[in-house]
């Protein structure tokens, strides 16, 4: 069994591979690929040119090795290495892939090539692949595997163990799923329970009847939550009639969690939700990030318009301009903190309809406490920093910071919840849209308070 290696060895392997590629020592490369774990090869390929990526893939010693490497590669790299592969070669590789992996890879190709590949894969696999491809993206149906072990509820323990031993896909067996005569899921048996039960007992006597399952349309994020909540190694997938269709395994769940977390982090940073952004070209990268920057630009123009509206006030009291960055900064930061906390709570299931209002009130209280503390500090400091003898200047600055931070926490906490109820991804609430809105509100409040107290 090949073992995974550490980062220092990865660096050494990468430099060795690059040197051998330059020397065109293809035989040596094949020998290294045979001995190296595919996950490590996939990691190395990220830093290679597209030509070298294809060369490494072509030098894999067997179709089985290529299949295992495809399982580890990023989606964008899979497209590149298979781009010029013939449908015949792809079908050979597919013999060693699960049907859900086959469906995912076929979905990357144009429709014409999809049909050509489907005609060349095995008949049994073809039906399963076409079924998986028919389900919506990011649903349980689209990520389930059909290679699983099921038995009728009237099967004895002795017969079950015998059939289990002869099952070809035994690396996918986490649980034994029990079906009735209509292929409906009626129970589940752990392998431990199976081997410790009497041979004469039937599965319906030892199975667990209270089953957690997903339907084909269940969002993959909900599947991941169920697996994490109940510590399952796999989750069964059924249709609306409770007919058993397949399972989502723990390795797929790990991938789902990683993908969803990456999407959330990217959206929270305001760079879209493309998980492969690091592997995109500069032009593609700029295109995905441009809309988010545009939101900040529009917000900045709005803030500039508000400042221009109060131009006469600034002409009279120019020192007010010095504290605009402070007002914007504290409001934006505390608002982002609140929205991040709520987004994380929604993702983990700790925030729901039952505790929505208490949570918003709690964040509002946090914003008020921080607003009082920082408002007092900056308000008193303003009198000394400016060196201007102006009554109520500190009051204006302190009150503006208090209002900005209080409102920012309320907005930051409530917007993700509202977006969730409207069916949008709440992660976008921590991006430029909300922070820009908080900046505009903060600037407007600052000048309204200043004009009210200092002029009137």
State what each model feature region is:
Residues 440-441:
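Active-site His/Glu-centered metal-binding helix of metallohydrolases
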Residues 1-272:
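Hydrophobic packing positions in regular secondary-structure scaffolds
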Residues 261-410, 414-428, 432-436, 445-456:
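Alpha-helical transmembrane segments and their membrane-interface boundaries
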